[in-house]
Each structure stands twice: as C-alpha cells, then as structure tokens.
C-alpha cells in the first residue's frame, strides 16, 4: 500500500464501494492521486481483487490517459516490490497493456471495431483527419447547393431563406449557417430528432400564453434579475434624499418609482401571464423631477439622478427588447419564421445524410461519428421512447466491474448516455466513479454540459451508505496560503448559482493543505501577497498631479511614432516585473521558490514563470516581442500565425503564380522576395512598361526589351514556365521540395536571423502538402484552395518553435492549455480585455435547450429585428458565457503555487475605479448577480472585490478626491499589493542581465562538484571572471536624442547606477483611430508644435489659419479642436512674443545634429585612452530669433505645470536648454544670449 497520508475525505473516495460516487475535487485537491490509489487498492484487495482490465478508466485527453497508465504502472511496480512473490499483482502489470485506460473517443473506436457488423460499417474503415474531413464537407455542401439551384421550382422556401439571411452577392452566409448548425447538433445523441423538436416549437398557436414557453420563462427570469438589481440602489437613493439638504421635493417621486418597481417585481414573481406583464411594463411612467432649491447638495443630486436614469434605462430596455409584443403578435412572427427554419433544418439533415454517404463510400468516419456510432451500438429506443441498453451493451456491463470517469464536469450528453448504457445502474448495482470540479468546467464551446455534474452534485447524498454518494475534496495541496486566501476572497464575493452556476461558500472554498517548509536563507524572500498591477493606457486633460510630484512634460510621453499599443504597454510592464523578480529588493533579498526535486529553496528561474492569457491571438506575438526585447527567453505555443510568417507567404505566393501567373499581388511578392530579388526600381520599370496590363503581361513585355531589368525578367519567366510544366506531373509536396532546392530559398532563409525557425516553418508547409495528398485529393489548385479555406475558417496553426517549453524559458499560454498544470509563479495578464460576446450577434443563435433564435426578417418590407426567441437565447447565452468566464478565471488563479501576479490595462483609472466603487458598495457579502452580469472583463470582478479589502486604500482612492466609499471593508486573511502605473512608468524598458543568472548557476555547480580538479576549477573561474575590455562601451548608442538624454539624467537623479535605456519597437496609432478615445497629451503637444511652426504670427486670424490647415489636410479635425487659440494669442501678446515679432529673422522647428564625446554623456564610464568614439546628439529647437549679433532661444511646453512652479521647471529642463544653446552656437556661430521656456498652460515665461 502507498505510504501517503490521506485525508479523511480522500480515504473515503479511495475505499467507498458499491455505489455511484461523485467526487467533487477542487483545484489542487489531489484527484489524480486519489484515482490511481483507488485503482491500485481494487486490484490488490485481499478479499475481492479485480483485474486491471476489468476497469474502464475514461480520461479527457490522450495525454491524461498516458499519464494515468504510467502512474498506475509505477504504483503496481512499487506494490510488487513490497509484495514479493505475489503472482496476482505481477499479473496486473502484464494486463495493464490491454487495460481500458483511454479517452471516451478511443473507447468508442474500440466498441465500433469490435461490433462493426451491428451498424453495417466497413470493418477496414479509417478515421478522416481534419484536412480530409474539411474538404469532404466542402465538397458535399457545394454539391447540395448546386442541386438546389438546378431544381429551383421545387425549392422556393430555400430562396426565401436566401433572401432573408443570405448575403447580397452569394450564398456563403447560408453555407456557413448550415455548417455551424450541423457542427452544433453533433453533441446531441440523435441530431435529427433534436432539429425536428426545436423547429416544431415555432409552430406556436395564437391564443396561447407566450410566458409558458421555455423562451418566455427565461425572459421572465432574466427580467426579474435585472429588476431586483435596482432594489438596493433605489432604496439607497431614497435614503440619500432624506439625509441631504434641499432635495425634499425629490422624495415623493422616488418613492413612487420605487413602489412601481416593487409591483413589477411582484408580478414577475407571481407568474402573471405574458400579456399582463406586457401591459404593465409599457404603462410604467416616470414623472418629471421637480426643481430643487439653490441650497440643494449638488453631489447628492447628481448621484440620485444617475440612479433614476439607470432605472429608466432598465425599464426602457425591457420595453424595447423583451416586452415589445403581445403573445398573439409573437405567435404571428413564429408562424412566419416556421417554414424558413424548417428549410434550414432540412438543409442540415440533407447535408448530414450526404456527408455520411460520402464517408461510407470511402470507408471512412470522422471524429464525431465515433460517439454516435458507439451510441447506436450500445443504445436503443423502445416503443415508449425510453432509451435502454442493447445486448452488446450488456456484454460491456458484464466486462467492467467499475467505470471511472476523470474530468466528469466536461462530459456531454452523448458521453453520458454511453456511460449509462454500460454501467450497472439499471440493474440496481451502480458502479460509476466520477471525479471532477464543476468550477473548472470551461469547455461549453465544445458543448460540454456542466449541468450533468451539477444535477448529481445537488441530488447525491453525503451519507456513506447511499447508493448515490458525493464526497467533497476541497483541501488544496498545491498553493501557498497567500494564494489560496486570495482566491477564496475573490470567489466568495463573485460566484453564485446565477452567475457561475455554483454558490462559492464556506463549503466550496479551498482549504490550504500544501506544506511549504520555512526558508532558512535570510537573503531570499518567498511567497508574498497577491499582486494586482493596473496600467492606465491614456491620460486625459484632467490629469491631477499628486502632491510633490513633478510636472509632466509632453516629451516625457512617447513621440507620435512611439505611442505604445495597449497590449504592448501591459507586456512591457510584465517584462519589467519579471526582471524585478531576479533582482534584489530594497532589503537586498532575491525571490526564491521551492524546488520539489531538490527538496530545497533556490532562486527563481525563467522556467518557473508562466504568463496566462485568456486569448493568445494578437497577445502572444506582442508579449513575446516585448520579453525578447528585454532579453527574457520566452516560449509561446500560439497555435496560430503559421500562414502569416514571411517565408511561408513567399512560398504560397510562388505556388499561386505557378498555378495562375495573372495574380498581381502574389507575383509582386515573389518578385520582391530573395527568390527573384527585384528592387523597387526594377518593379517600377516593369510597371511603366505597360501601366494598363497585369504585372505578368508587363513582365513579359519587359523581358523582350533591351533594358537593365530585361535579363532578370527573362530568366524568371523561363523558370516560371518550367515550374508550371513540372506542376502538371509532380505531386504538390514534390514540387515544393524541388522549389526549395532549385531556388535556394530554403538555404537563404536558414542564413537569416532566426533561420532555424524559418526553415522549420518551410518543412511544416512541405509536410502539410504531403499530408494533404495522402487524402483522396490532389493537385496544386486544390491544395491552394484548401490552404485558403484553412485561413478563412480559423484553421491556422502555430509557427515552428526552436525553443522548447522544457527549456529555461518563460512560458506563454492560454488559460485553457494551462488546465491541469501548476507553476511556481503565475502572471495572469490581459484582465482588462473585453469578454468575447460576438456569438450573440449572429443572425441565428443556437442553444442546447432553447433551440433556434433567429432574427425576424421580412425582406419584402425590408424589416429586420431580433425575434423574441433570439432575445431569450441571447440573455441565456450571456449568463452562461459569463458563468464560464468566471470559471476560466478560477482555473487561471488556481494554477499558481507560490506567487500570483494579476495585470490589466484600463483606459482611464479614475472612471474605471468609480465604476468598480459602485459595485463594491453593495452591502451584501456576495455581489448581486445583476452586478456580476454587467462585467465586461475580469477586472470588473476582481477590482470591486479587492476594493472592499482592508489593504485596498490605493484602489479606493483611485476613484478621485472627494469620492466617499460607503461599502463594507473586509478584514480578510488574504494579502494584496496594488500597483497603479501609467505610461511614464514603462517609458524606459528594462533589460535582463543575462550573465547574472548563468554565472550563479555555474558557480553553484562548481561548488557542488567540490572534488573537481583544482587546476580545472581555477581555469574555469579565470574564464568566468574575464571581461571584454570595451564591454561597457558596447552598450553605447551611436546616436541619442535630447529627450532621451533628459530622461536618462532625470532617472539617474532618482536612482543610482541607472543605465540609459531605449524604447523598443513601438506601434503608431492609425489616423482613423485618433478620434475614438481622444488625443493623448503627447499628441496634443505635437499638434500645437505643428501649428506654432506654420502660423503667420503677423496675421491675427489664428483660428482662420488653423481652418486652412485642416482644409489642406495638414491637420485633422480632432487635432484642430485640441488647439487652444487663446493660449497662442496670449503667447504672441506676451513680452517675449512681441520681441519675436519685432525680430527680422525668426526660425522655428530647427533640427540639429552635433557630436559629443562619450564621457560627456556617460561620465561613469572608465577613461580609455584608445577609445575615441563620439555620440551623435539629435534634437529640434522650437524657436529662436536674432537680435543684433546674438540669439534668443524659446522652448514651448504644452503640458500641465502648476502655476508659479518655475524653479522645478528650471531644474527639469536645464540640461535640455543647455544642449539646445550649444547646438545653436555651433550651427550659427553666434552667441545664445537669452534662453526662455514659455508655459502654455499658465502663460508664464521662465528665464533659464
């Protein structure tokens, strides 16, 4: 037996017999260990041992099945060592090879292969891979639609469908609709039966109460939830009015509104019929608020008005979206949609039958067939419609003494019926062991039904003598108490039966069970509070400087071409925090983690860190780039991006023009690539040869003329003709390999930066072509079409990886991929990203219980609106989607063993904090469901919860000065560190000192190898200690701007030994996005400088001049609106402005470049006599003018600076103005006599 010390609950789960047993095992509760131990005890039971092959163990993935088999094998081997001579146990190791430890699909495959004759399938059938299945479906659908068009007279309803839901130019929307519905219904035991039942629900008769339908009940339920959510805030409003001065006249109106609200809530609860509710909602009236006296408290007045506006918004929403029709009107709409939906259903069924026939002709099955064929073998329906096991199922009942299902929360209805058919439940001997955690059910998009788990969880007994028992495992053996406490703190507030589908309470919460020994090393720090990092991605005009803070300079923000994308900003913040984990803190301590293999604490490594993202699309590329720029090694298994890699695009373009050279874009891509290597001048010559022809025709004309590019064009055309001939007799994969060799492109990309990965991508493309031609399809044109379909149908795959996830790298992965894994340090990032609700806006929604939800369309009258069923399904999908998102958040947070760091970005921290504050002020310990349903991202759940924490003063204060927090303050065991950052905090990217960790690791290795030869050891140390003479100088840039130089010295004044850093690749904001969130201070400053550069100061019509700039498209409308004409006028009329107007020569926006000795910028570097390199200093002087024989310099500042704070301005810009003066004197050979800074924000002139 194992020597593990099991908890009471674990022991019960291991030893309980003769029942259906549901084990609800929370994250880190050791469910796999319990499952393995249960199996081992069953096969080694002294009184009633069973053979391992008499157990059916069902896992969720193949990897899990392999791991389970290995762990059981290891456990059996250990048991053999302790029980020498036991033939039975030794026999189990032999039987293990044929034991049914498998995924449900693998089990189904075994059932089909063993019983193929019962469903009349070819015994030699093969399973279609995704490639061939996609092609076969496409072919089937094309054939189906072609036949429909040929027999148009018999398919009038199809053309009604096409007019109503098709596109303007083609039928692709209808094809997509058929495919999506077909895929959706495959998770049902009998898809055609489900379709027929759901379509018939539209055959709704006039005179019936719509409130009695499933759709009506859902709408009443969700409406009640929205209305009850208004109760607390309306009561709060009445209380505020009573206690406020001058608002007495409001009270009667608010009381009346509140009474009407309560009546409406009561009607919803009592189940009044639909039409009565319709009448009441549409008769709900709001009186105008009376005028209040001048003594009214304005802040309270605005607050209660907002609450009343919210009430109005909800009532109006119910009128417009729910109760906008009476039952008979709804019945009329449903009757209108009935024939069209029946047509959709028929199309789906026809497609399914034709697709099945094509598969049968090829002796093939696809992945979905495995479950359905298995179900047909094991289940049958009697004359009363009851499902019962077949004789074959009875054989499996006899074979398996117990069925053990892992990750039960992710089962679907088909799988549930299959398990029931082979279990002994129906003969009074329940024998199914199910283990899982409904809080980790995150696969609804695969039609998983957590309701199956919940139904048993709510109905099974905790009584140990019950035939249907549940056992709860909530002790977490994975995470530190700091992590567990934080998870419990959040989810006890946000997760409920209505949002989350489970009430997270004292019974459900995690109990710390991980035994982390104290760290004895005083130079390290372990564990620690959960960190919440929020970065504000844009700063508006209302930025308030905290006391003692420095005024912002527009040059402290990135220039227009340095504006960081929001994802990039968060990624840089994360990169900086990762670097900090490797550096000593303010107390000189480094972060350490416990190494299970070593049995001791050690410094953190990159491989200890994971970055979890809700979605990897777009995010992983940006995060990978930022981490790489910081010299942090990273591995990201993105699962997409392969077709976007330049090397793959070039080869695909080459294949496209071999198939059809009359395609300009792919032809240009090939010509410009290293395969042909045309320059832009060459391409210009080709285009000018014949501007009206295709590029291919122009290229042919170029080849016959005597020009510089003719020879290159002729050579390429000869090769292209040869390749086109080869494509007629060569297979596609052979052609691709021939092209690699003949063009040398494979070798060329290998010589490029990151060449190993590029070559790996080209090998993948070759293998993809080979895989494609192993199907029944072939030909270059078909392969290109197939690739195009993969791109459009989200069939992209990940780019090749040359770094492995087992290397010492930071891993980037989706939360879904992290399920079942654990990591010492977890960064949960992108928490400010909006939830994806796109599925709610399709023309037809689908739901497992509610069926179809289409738009109502009358194309003849050009009327379209969401039908009532669609509104019901949309409401239900929203609740289920947010419930799943909440469970995904739980999965993410429970991956952390020792440290959890949560990050997110917000556009405006003050506005976001005010929104969170409104939620946090609820008096209930658990937030009301309607508040949780308002969430747009994870921060909308996390931040209101954290706001209530005793340690969250920073987050509460972020709502702004004068905002009172009246909600509860929770004294919880959890500990939180909150960091609010803005763009200035990440303006300078940190870089990881790569040699630091390497040296420490090698030194430690040498110490462990104490017996090594002393001479060798001395030589190794000598080599490690050697430093390149000019190592410090290798980091010096060849050029630097004055702005960067100013920032560098500013940082050096704040932190000792700071090094000058540079922003890495940044992302411009496209012009069309300027107006969406307003201009940043940096953008406004740029616009102001542009205007100041081009204004005619002698022309008093400044506004007119700005309008002309807009007309000439020198400025956008948004930029023009940001220009403060009065401030420019104030400058012109100031003392320095008038002097400038009198000057004969005025110069504006003057660029300069001057060389400086390196010691002047890097005084901390050593003096090296033979090192004479200089640095190029660049900058732009705003304005200077000449007076007699000298120069007067003016620099504008457009950013906010407090009035009268001239001294800090002088200190901050002294260095910058000094370099400007020096540059002007070198350029003009005249003395800069006076230097001024003009502050647009206050109109002050600061003499430097």
UniProtKB/Swiss-Prot annotation:
Gene Ontology MF terms: 3'-5' DNA helicase activity; 3'-5' exonuclease activity; ATP binding; ATP hydrolysis activity; double-stranded DNA binding
Cofactor list: Mg(2+)
GO cellular component, one term: DNA helicase complex
Binding annotation for ATP: 25-32
Catalytic activity: Couples ATP hydrolysis with the unwinding of duplex DNA by translocating in the 3'-5' direction; ATP + H2O = ADP + phosphate + H(+)
Keywords, sorted A to Z: ATP-binding, DNA damage, DNA repair, DNA-binding, Exonuclease, Helicase, Hydrolase, Isomerase, Nuclease, Nucleotide-binding
Domain UvrD-like helicase ATP-binding stretches: 4-480
PROSITE patterns for the chain: UVRD_HELICASE_ATP_BIND, UVRD_HELICASE_CTER
Role this protein plays: The heterodimer acts as both an ATP-dependent DNA helicase and an ATP-dependent, dual-direction single-stranded exonuclease. Recognizes the chi site generating a DNA molecule suitable for the initiation of homologous recombination. The AddA nuclease domain is required for chi fragment generation; this subunit has the helicase and 3' -> 5' nuclease activities.
Family annotation (HAMAP family): AddA
Family: Belongs to the helicase family. AddA subfamily.
Subunit structure, as described in the record: Heterodimer of AddA and AddB/RexB.
Annotated protein name in UniProt: ATP-dependent helicase/nuclease subunit A
Native source organism of the sequence: Ruminiclostridium cellulolyticum (strain ATCC 35319 / DSM 5812 / JCM 6584 / H10)
Gene that encodes the chain: addA
